[in-house]
């Protein structure tokens, strides 16, 4: 947990301390709950995994499917509205900003056609995902 928190401090100039990350960053909470939910998902306790992930969604506004594979040091900054789908595979040291959806890439009317196939993106290491970014300079 210490390396994870330090990796966020290294990437976010607004992060002041590890304690502030734990108490005030929803992305930290979402990743923590995902690790627990994923443990239960891998162990085939799917209902428990989904309950944990839905509690996390309620608490943080970030939805991570328990089956998603997430590498080390995922940083979800300003996480409201982030969705990470079931077959997503995320590498190490990835940063995701608000409103990003790693959703299904093959929509279908018949969900049976999509069971047990890869339908969400794979994200490599050291990637930053920003959706709809608008940067303003000092004067607009």
Question: Model-flagged regions — what are they?
Answer:
Residues 1-60:
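Terminal amphipathic alpha-helical/low-complexity segments used for targeting or macromolecular assembly
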């Amino acid at each position: 947990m210490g390396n994870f928190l330090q990796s966020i401090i290294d990437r976010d100039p607004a992060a002041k301390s590890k304690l502030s990350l734990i108490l005030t960053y929803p992305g930290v909470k979402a990743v923590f709950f995902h690790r627990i939910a994923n443990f239960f998902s891998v162990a085939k306790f799917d209902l428990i995994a989904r309950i944990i992930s839905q509690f996390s969604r309620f608490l943080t506004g970030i939805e991570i499917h328990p089956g998603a594979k997430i590498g080390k040091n995922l940083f979800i900054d300003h996480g409201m509205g982030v969705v990470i789908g079931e077959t997503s595979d995320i590498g190490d040291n990835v940063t995701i900003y608000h409103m990003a959806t790693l959703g299904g890439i093959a929509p279908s009317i018949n969900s049976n056609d999509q069971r047990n196939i890869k339908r969400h993106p794979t994200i490599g290491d050291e990637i930053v995902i920003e959706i709809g970014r608008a940067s303003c300079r000092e004067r607009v």
